[in-house]
Curated annotation (Swiss-Prot):
Major location (coarse): host cell
Family: Belongs to the influenza viruses PB1-F2 family.
UniProt subcellular location: Host mitochondrion inner membrane; Host nucleus; Host cytoplasm, Host cytosol
Domain of life: Viruses
Protein's name in the database: Protein PB1-F2
GO biological processes: symbiont-mediated perturbation of host apoptosis; symbiont-mediated suppression of host cytoplasmic pattern recognition receptor signaling pathway via inhibition of MAVS activity
Classification via InterPro entries: Flu_proapoptotic_PB1-F2
Length: 90
């Protein structure tokens, strides 16, 4: 039986179970995770991405040199519009 080509998707969605045979050899059994495991994995990755976005955003705020209230307001509005546009398209 031929094994399907390993891709990043199949590698990340398959779990490898190693079982010992009676003679000491190890066999690998590829097992597809259930939907709950996939959703859990997806949510974990997305929350990490979201945390990274927030960190980058705060670093940009902290890098501003003595901003005026007007420049902050302009910056916030630009970021808000950009963020909303990305939310609607994704």
């Amino acid at each position: 039986m031929e094994r399907e080509q390993d891709t990043p998707w199949t590698q990340s969605t398959e779990h490898i179970n190693i079982q010992k045979r009676g003679n000491g050899q190890q066999t690998q059994k590829l097992e597809h995770p259930n939907l709950t495991q996939l959703m859990d994995h997806y949510l974990r990755i997305m929350s990490q991405v979201d945390m990274h976005k927030q960190t980058v955003s705060w670093k940009q705020w902290l890098s501003l040199k003595s901003p005026t209230q007007e420049s902050l307001k302009t910056r916030v509005l630009k970021r808000w519009k950009l963020f909303n546009k990305q939310e609607w398209t994704s």
